[in-house]
Each structure stands twice: as structure tokens, then as C-alpha cells.
């Protein structure tokens, strides 16, 4: 047991350049995206994950943060986007099946149709690529679900630091 960690074995963290805006501009030229564009996007995501994250421990919990995950959670749970607050979605689970179902619905809609269904303008443009990243990542990790968190990684690092200051 690592000293001072209360039995924690360690946490895996990895940053990979798979931003939804960059991927949208690079791969999703049509509105709605064409099948070949979606296939190329998925292939790129898979290749990037295989190259940058060749190993990840099985059965580890996956925490999803950020706007795409929050929007997917809201869509699946019929939460209006203006009602997305940490108290409402933190700790909720999203399964791979639920994420892929949302992606399948969105990929056949135009940006305007996504906006009509409640996505804000900026998010509606990148949501398909963002959801594809989340889905492909869960597949890569052999994970069946993720836990939604509106706290981001920087906030988590700050909290860990502050807790260490208080107990150190």
C-alpha cells in the first residue's frame, strides 16, 4: 500500500489530442456527415487511441468530463441544456449503448436540426465528433459505461493539492 494514499493503487491518466472541433473540421465536411466521413473519423480516433494509449487496466472506472459528456447525459436523460448543473448530472452513468444511440440519432441530423432539438449553436457543430470520441474511447478501454462529472481535471488536481496542504 503506498504510504499516505489510504490504499489507493494509483490512477491512470492520459491526455490525447482528439478535440471535437479539430476532428469536425478535419473529417466531417458534409451536413449531416456522410457515412465515409464517419468511417474515416472512427478510424482516425481508433488509430490515435491505439498509438497513444496502447494499454489501460481493465475494469477501471471511467469518469467523463466536459461539454460533450454533459450534453450526452442531458440528451439521454431528457434534461434541458439550461438545466445542466453539477447537482443534476454529477455521478450519473452513461452506458456505451446510450452514447452510441445518441450518436446514431445525431449523425443523421443537420446542424440546424440539432439546434432545433435543443443543442446550442457551438455545441451542435462539434457534437457528432465529440460523441464519436467518447464512444470509441469506451470501446478502446473495454468499458461499458462512464460516470458523468462536471468537475474538470484542473479542478480535480487543485482539490488534490488543497487536500494535501490541509493534511500534509
Regions found by a protein language model. Give the residues of each.
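Helical "lid/coupling" subdomains associated with nucleotide-phosphate turnover
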Residues: 3-168
